[in-house]
Amino acid sequence: MNAPYQVDKITAAQFSDWQQQAQQIPLSLPTLNPYIPSDFSLIPSDGKHYDHPVALTNGDSMRIYWMPSQFYASEPKAAITLALRNKSAISDARQQVLFGLNDYLSSLALDELNSQASVGGISFSTGEDDGLVFNASGFTQRLPELLKKLVEGYASFQPDAQQLEQAKSWYLDRLEAAEKGKAFEQAIQPMQMLSQLPYTQREARRQLVKQITLQEVMDYRDALIQHATPEMMVVGNLSADRVRQLGEELKQQLHSTGHGYWHSNYVVVDKPIKANLQKTGSSTDSALATLYVPLGYSEYQSMANSTMLSQIVQPWFYNQLRTEEQLGYAVFAYQMPIGRQWGIGFLLQSNSKAPAYLLQRFQAFYPQAEQRLRSMKAEDFAQYQQALINDLKQRPQTLDEEANRYSRDFNRQNFAFDTREKAIAQIQQLTPASLADFFHQAVLAQQGMAMISQIGGSHDGTHDADYAPLPGFTTWDEVARLQQSLSVKSDAP
């Protein structure tokens, strides 16, 4: 091509101008992610077999429990739980609101750290269990430093007024969402809430949100950490010495004043209670939930019986009320504890029948279920029994799942970590007759707590006739008041 063109010389002035502009352009390499691992070495085996985490500390020092992984020792990973136990964390409605706002604000502040950790193969979370709980798991080389950075970030973030308003909006949205769930979710909520000590009504918390100030959130955050009693559990590829060192570093970092051994409280069913709760739902569907917790059974006996019952009775309940009677499309039999006593429950959501009719059908099903339990062949029962035991003995699928097996015991200060073993031992002792006796005492004789939760459909306004009449039952307008009528215990000596 013969297109015309021209070449001009670059003058010294142009060079000088470009050089000056270049000096004003900030150029640098990206900051290195400090949590990307480079060392994947494994801790040497000490030749011991660990059935559960063991104590690394004694006396009034920070309680630390540790064990190497029994299933994933070839993975350079660990799972750490740091619990800052604090009786004042959520002891009233205001503190519960403060915890929720604080947790949301911390998630904003820790977002960059979360992103860095994720790229480095580490995940972490914060939550509440008798205080603030940090969980971190992943590759072990950077894990202790990440946990310390997480604690530091939580203890030092400084939100602004706009972020507080954002947190308040989020919290109110959560409260509203809980009240607009599906009918069966609303029906079972009172059973779930009853063990949350102390439970406070959502309306009470909603009224408090506007009053909360930024300084109050910061003061609460500081007290949450400073007045706590720290405890830690580690499972995986960290040596006992490194875990002790980490515990000492965290103690110095936290400056927590709590000391001595922590013991949580829990509600207790120690007398016959018949409780009813009822309200209009947020949809046109109705729902009914029942829960029966018998007296006279230990925690592990009730756990074994209720778990076994839910496995056996669920298909019977579903087939009768869903398949044959076509009463609804969310149909469940379930086990659930009130405090540390387990019971058996039934739940159904219907788009055509009111709670009063649903309870009639529940009550027609109960004696049929008892009769089927009593007439069950020994070999059929043994199959259910062995399947449940095999499930409890199944190998964990991940290191996190292995660690989670000990979390419930850790959170309730059962440092023998033997809930699973005790449950299996009780399941092995069950017979068709003993299981039927548990069912009879709980559901038919109602020798313990019988709890009914009725949700009326909102299609044309719920009428009193839609709710089941329950002679002998007390109808409670608030779960909080029902909870306050129960006894409270602690395992503290």
PLM region descriptions:
Residues M1, S74-Q211, H227-V235, A287-G296, ...:
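M16 family metallopeptidases and their MPP-like homologs
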Residues M1-F71, A187-I212, E216-L250, Y266-V268, ...:
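C-terminal regions of mature proteins
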Residues A55-L82, V97, S283-D285:
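Active-site-adjacent "gating/activation" loops or surface patches in catalytic cores
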Residues M67-F71, G120-F124, M218-R221, N276-G281, ...:
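Short beta-strand/turn micro-motifs at beta-sheet edges
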Residues Y266-K279:
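Short Gly/Thr-rich strand-loop-strand
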